[in-house]
Curated annotation (Swiss-Prot):
Keywords: Ribonucleoprotein, Ribosomal protein, RNA-binding, rRNA-binding. This is Large ribosomal subunit protein uL24. Part of the 50S ribosomal subunit. Gene3D superfamilies: 2.30.30.30. InterPro entries: KOW (IPR005824), Rib_uL2_dom2 (IPR014722), Ribosomal_uL24 (IPR003256), Ribosomal_uL24_CS (IPR005825), Ribosomal_uL24_KOW (IPR041988), Translation_prot_SH3-like_sf (IPR008991). The gene is rplX. It comes from Chlorobium phaeobacteroides (strain BS1). It comes from the Bacteria. One of its GO terms (biological process) is translation.
Length: 80
C-alpha cells in the first residue's frame, strides 16, 4: 500500500514568463514567482492583486492594508 503525496507535473516553472489567458487579468503577462503543484496553482507577478488586512505588529504599529499577488489556477496561464 502506497502512502504519500502524488507527484504532479505542471507546464510552467518558477521564473517562466507567462500570459494569462482567462479571468479578470486576461491578457496580462508576468513572471511566475511561486508554484503550488499539489493545488495546481501559480503566483504570477502583477496578476490577481488582492488587498490583505494586517494586524498591528512592530513593523506595522497601526496595522495596514497590503496589496499582494494571490494564486491563480495553472490552466489559466500559458508560456510566452
Amino acid at each position: 500500500m502506497k502512502t504519500g503525496i502524488k507527484q504532479v507535473k505542471l507546464h510552467v516553472r518558477k521564473n517562466d514568463t507567462v500570459l494569462v489567458i482567462a479571468g479578470n487579468d486576461k491578457g496580462k503577462t508576468g513572471k511566475v514567482l511561486r508554484v503550488f503543484p499539489q493545488k495546481n496553482r501559480v503566483i504570477v507577478e502583477g496578476v490577481n492583486i488582492r488587498k490583505r488586512h494586517v494586524r498591528p505588529t512592530q513593523s506595522h504599529p497601526q496595522g495596514a492594508i497590503i496589496e499582494r499577488e494571490f494564486p491563480i489556477h495553472a490552466s489559466n496561464v500559458k508560456k510566452s
